[in-house]
Amino acid sequence: MSMKKIIAALLALVLTVSLAACGAAETPTATAAPKEEIKVTEAAVAETEASGTRTVVDALGRTVEIPAEVTRIVAMGNAPRLCSYLQLADKFVTTNQGDLSETVFMAFGWAYRDNWQDLPIAGAGGYGSFNAEAILEADPDVIVCTYEADIVANLEAQTGLPVVSVAQGVLYAEDYEQSLRTLGEVCGVSQRAEEVIAFVNACLEDLDRRTKDISDADKPLILGSAATFRGGHGIQGVYVDHPVFSAVNAKDAAIGLEKQYFDTGVEVDLEKILEWNPEVLFLDAGNLGLVEAEYAENPDFFQQLAAVQNGKVYQWPNSTSSNANLEISLVNTYYAGMVLYPEAFADVDFEAKAEEIFEFFLGRTGYLEVLTEHGVGYDNITLGE
């Protein structure tokens, strides 16, 4: 019997009591230490080689001793999504209830949930709750997560296992890259981490190159609405400082609006939307039913909008399901660019580009078709029909 399983047997009784105290309240995810990379000093290497371990510094600034080789992973919070991008899904020894969701917008879940269906449940998902006994029984080498220090300390205390916390990451930002690099180093897939980072950056450079020299006078005013943050919203829920729009240098009506910490959007008054009068509307397809209900109740409001009058209302898949989907966000960014600046993207086959991105991240083909079959793909729509 492995040492971890011996620990599991010894802790089983006390865990029954301690687990009852574990709440499922929403907790902010880990934030990255300023430009901290994983650090393995020569002294640490020399000291740990004999014991088959190594040390890493995580996003919380903690030095964590982990096995020299990691083959069995428990991933929690947003880490399952990040690990899936790194092709680590087959190393999971547990899953989370939320990652088995049937929603089509959880792209990594669509790709891998069949692989995880029979794994023990380690927790609910992204809120910090966990089942320590199930984790110990699964005998992992390491736990990776996106939790804050108090949850990480509790997780380590109840399992006796090394816990590495990475930043949840802001879409297209440096801390997202850092999280991928940290997970790549911990799990022995640094090359794949660099490939993912290079792929994203190549896409962003391509998008910027195509759009950076377009004058503001030639850009339509746009709004991302029916936004997904803390649940779905109707027309009054708008994305703020949306990285998808920034990546194509769009003229975004909602840029600079004040928002709550960790939120990606806000609710605004109908009068504010009329004041903006966006020429193009992008709506999250998963929340389109809310907008259609609002249209049925108040068609006069919608018919005053230039986007509605000119047939410039578009749906795209929700880029958020619990946390941001990197692959959907990238495809949405290309879609926005092609809608807003068709001449700049005249040489891009959208379906081919979308399939390329989805397959790179998910290791599966056919996801674009799945979105279309569910009625939540990419389309120019008419409200009220």
Predicted regions, residues:
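Alpha-helical, coiled-coil/dimerization segments enriched in small aliphatic residues
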Residues: 237-264
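Bacterial N-terminal signal peptides that target proteins for export
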Residues: 1-10
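A short, structured surface patch at a secondary-structure boundary
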Residues: 76-138, 142-145, 253
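Bacterial lipoprotein signal-peptidase II cleavage site
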Residues: 18-32
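N-terminal low-complexity, Pro/Thr/Ser-rich intrinsically disordered segments
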Residues: 33-62, 66-67
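Short helix-initiation/N-cap motifs at beta->coil->alpha
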Residues: 59-61, 118-132, 259-270
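Extracytoplasmic substrate-binding proteins
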Residues: 63, 152-232, 262-265, 315-383
